[in-house]
Design a protein with these regions (language model features):
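Helix-terminus/linker motif at the lipid-water interface of multi-pass membrane proteins
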Residues: 31-50, 119-126, 182-189, 250-277, ...
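Transmembrane helical elements of multi-pass membrane transporters/channels
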Residues: 17-36, 138, 172, 201-205, ...
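Short runs within selected transmembrane alpha-helices of multi-pass transporters and secretion channels
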Residues: 70, 139-157, 165-173, 194-209, ...
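Structural signal for membrane-spanning alpha-helices in multi-pass inner-membrane proteins
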Residues: 111, 154, 180, 184, ...
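Small-residue-rich hydrophobic transmembrane alpha-helices
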Residues: 49-109, 146-165, 271-335, 367-389, ...
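Short alpha-helical transmembrane segments in multi-pass integral membrane proteins
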Residues: 1-19, 77-142, 188-240, 297-363, ...
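N-terminal transmembrane alpha-helices
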Residues: 6-44, 60-72, 76, 80, ...
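Residue-level hotspots within pore-lining transmembrane alpha-helices
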Residues: 24, 28, 32, 62-66, ...
Length: 442
């Protein structure tokens, strides 16, 4: 692959060079979970789909940990390279790898020792717990691959290898789809088979990503001599906003499950599983746009080329709005088709699902711009502003509206929580952008 100079290449050309590989690479999370959801909903049924939604939070935390270390470390690496600092790749990559191994072991220990209490806390019931146990059997030993798939992708994008990151996602995703069908239909392996297919796909994904380390243009080197534990705090600080996004999403799913059980029963969680899976696809696209801009923004920030950063910002925001509008329109035009992809519902349940999809999908019109703004602020080393956006849109506003509005207007109010939170956050994002326009101030 041609090795381009991100500080000199025309901005639009550099952005497009990263866009499709970044989008396809970030789709890996949604591919694994989306395929599982469709297969489980159609093959096993609504209760199994509700069980899958219960395990979303820990799975998102695993991927989020990879983003924490990968994006956090690679942003600092790119800024350091823009300033011509020596050994930046070795220092940050080695720190991220060692941290990832340690954190994966901690997660595995917690879920092995405290599995039942954790799942009951997340909302598992007597109806769903057996499905959850079957699904999590392959997931727990596969935790390192959840973390390292997203972590290595981030470093590869910043090492000018977006196509290798894309190849890993495609190979893992396609294999996951094939194995999902084989394990669930001919072999009738149920939830265990769906989960096993996902983990095998992740193993292949990581294996393909690791081929970059043998490439001639690889500058990422693992070296214990360059391990600097003091950098761990810097990596966490840099990557925490994007990690908190995944944490916030996990918490929000948990809160939604509580409210939906209260107002709708188990079918409410099934409907939300349809929405959250489709939302995950949209968010993956938004993250892809943001991550296409991230290495260009960080490298030019380190080099002090601020006009180029503003051009990247405009391209990213416009692209995010277009993607969001497409999802919003789809939610208004074909809500029933979207629901039918995942599971067959009764007439009354489909009525509720259609209303929920139409309301919730209006959030995508604003969500893409907010996610891009959050990642943009992180790329110009303004993690506090990025963190504020994350907390406001992901936990504070959504959580407050989620509990207040249903009490005022009934159960339909649950579905307005995210659209209203995203709309208000857009206004805050505009204010923060105006504050950050003079990025020379640091």
């Amino acid at each position: 692959m041609k090795n381009i100079d991100l500080t000199k290449e025309p901005v639009r050309k550099a952005f497009m060079h990263y866009l499709i590989p970044a989008v396809l690479a970030t789709m890996v999370t949604s591919i694994y979970i989306l395929v599982d959801t469709i297969m489980i909903g159609n093959r096993i049924g609504a209760d199994a789909l509700a069980g899958l939604n219960i395990v979303f939070p820990p799975i998102m935390i695993f991927f989020g940990t990879g983003n924490l270390l990968g994006i956090g470390g690679s942003v600092l690496m790119s800024v350091a390279l823009g300033r011509n600092e020596q050994n930046a790749q070795k220092k940050y990559f080695t720190t991220a790898v060692i941290s990832g191994i340690f954190i994966a072991l901690v997660y595995m220990f917690i879920l092995i020792v405290f599995f039942n209490p954790v799942m009951r806390f997340l909302g598992a019931s007597d109806v769903t717990i057996s499905y959850i146990k079957d699904y999590m059997k392959p997931v727990i030993p596969g935790i390192p691959f959840f973390i390292f798939s997203s972590m290595i992708q981030a470093f590869l994008r910043n090492d000018k290898a977006p196509k290798t990151a894309m190849a890993g996602s495609l190979c893992g995703g396609i294999l996951n789809i094939i194995l999902d069908y084989i394990f669930m239909y001919p072999l009738n392996m149920g939830m265990f088979g769906a989960s096993l297919a996902s983990v095998i796909g992740l193993v292949v994904n990581v294996a393909v990503l690791c081929t970059h380390f043998f490439a001639r243009n690889n500058s990422l080197k693992f070296s214990l001599k360059n391990l600097q534990l003091r950098l761990f705090a810097d990596v966490i600080k840099s990557g925490f906003p994007v990690f908190l996004t995944d944490i916030a999403s996990s918490v929000l799913i948990f809160l939604f499950n509580i409210q939906l059980l209260k107002y709708y029963g188990v079918i409410g969680i099934t409907i939300y599983s349809i929405i959250s899976n489709t939302s995950l696809t949209a968010v993956s696209l938004f993250n892809g746009v943001s991550q296409a801009a991230q290495p260009i923004t960080a490298m030019n920030y380190g080099a002090g080329k601020y006009d180029r950063i503003k051009k990247v910002f405009r391209l990213g925001v416009i692209t995010s709005i277009i993607v969001g509008a497409a999802f919003t329109i789809a939610g208004f035009i074909i809500p029933e088709r979207i629901a039918n992809i995942f599971v067959k519902l009764s007439e009354s349940d489909m009525f509720n699902a259609k209303k929920a999809i139409m309301i919730y999908f209006s959030a995508f019109l604003f969500m893409g711009a907010n996610i891009f703004m959050q990642n943009y602020l992180q790329s110009i080393v303004k993690p506090l502003l990025s963190l504020i956006i994350c907390v406001i849109r992901g936990i504070v506003l959504s959580g407050i509206i989620l509990f207040i509005l249903p009490a005022l207007i009934g159960k339909i109010g649950i579905w307005f929580a995210v659209p209203l939170a995203e709309a208000v956050t857009v206004l805050i994002s505009i204010i923060f952008y105006k504050r950050s326009r003079d990025i020379k101030s640091g």
